[in-house]
Each structure stands twice: as C-alpha cells, then as structure tokens.
Amino acid sequence: VPKKKVPRKGRSSFTRDEVKTLFQLPDSSNEIGLRDKTLLCFMYASGTRAQEVCDLTVGDIQFYPDRAGINIHGKGQKVRRIGIPCDASNMLKKYIEHRRIINDTGRHVFSSQTHEKMSVACIEEIYSKYIDKAKLEYPEMFRYSYTPHSMRHTTATHMLEAGVPLIVVKNFLGHVSLQTTQIYTEITQDTMNKQLKSWNDKWFLKDNSHFE
C-alpha cells in the first residue's frame, strides 16, 4: 500500500534584512568567524543543501573575474553546475587562499575544528549559534525557527521574487521535479499577501460611507 504523503509544515525563510544581519554577526577577524561568514554567504549565493556544502572541494570551483562556476554534488550522486556572483565568489576565493589550499584540489573547502571535512551537524551548530545570537540582539527580527535549509528556502524565494523563471530556479537548486520548486512560489505568494494586507490596513479607504 503506497504511503500517503504528509503535508510539510510551513517553511521558514529569512527576509533580506535578516540575511544582511546574519552576515554581520560572525567576527571575521578570527578563523572561526571568517569560516562561518564565508559559509553563510556561500549558502545564500548558491542555495546549496548542507550536505552539498560539506562535500564541496577546491577542485569543484573555477574562479573567473566576475563570478565562480561550481560543480555541486547533489542527491543521487548527480552533479549540477551553478554560478555564484562576484561578491560571493571573491569572498570564497579569499577564504580558500587564506587557508592556503587554493592548489590542493582534493581538499574540502569547509572544515571543522576537529575534522578536515565539515559535517551537517557542524553546520547546524553554526546556524543555531548565530540565530540564537540574532534573536537576542534583534528581538524584533528572527521570529521563527530556522535550520540550514532555511537559507536554501530563502535563496529560492528571493530568486522567484526577483523574477527568475521557475525552471531556472529548479535547475539551480537541483530539484528533480518542478513541483518541488513550486513550494517556494507559495512562500512568495504568502509574502505578497502580507504586503497587500499591510497596504489595505494602512492606505485603503476607511470611510465605509463611500460604499453605501
């Protein structure tokens, strides 16, 4: 008997202001802070899953003057080619150069304090650390529960809101089905509904006599 699909709960994503705030929290003057800031920015620019970030090696990346081309090793051993913009590319390159592994193609880009290859659990701890910090410092923001996958949701949502075609977002994220990507259009619609409600509450005619 085929199992019934359980509807997924609402997916939390970050607003643009929350993304900017999150990027500012790591102290990039030390090794851990520099790693964490680079990781957060890379995940937003690439929309990658946590495991895909763990698997990323120096040899997967080709740097160009205005961008980087990256081979992402996704689910089912499928590899997809994506590009990230100049700012994210420069940050990633500087981090790799800082680690002195730019010519070591087999090295993993992100490592933990104890292992050469970072784990998903380590990425989860990084997000938990900075989201907890953000909730304390900015109580009016970060009102929901977040995971590393929230950044992937955020990338998809912001791409769609910027007018990027659904099929392009699908390929960028490595979704097998377009139906999976359409989940994010619902988030975008929800964002639009909130904006419309705000407009109605603040600006629409309040005098009901106009309609009598």
Language-model segments: what does each one mean?
Residues 1-212:
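Conserved catalytic core of the tyrosine transesterase superfamily
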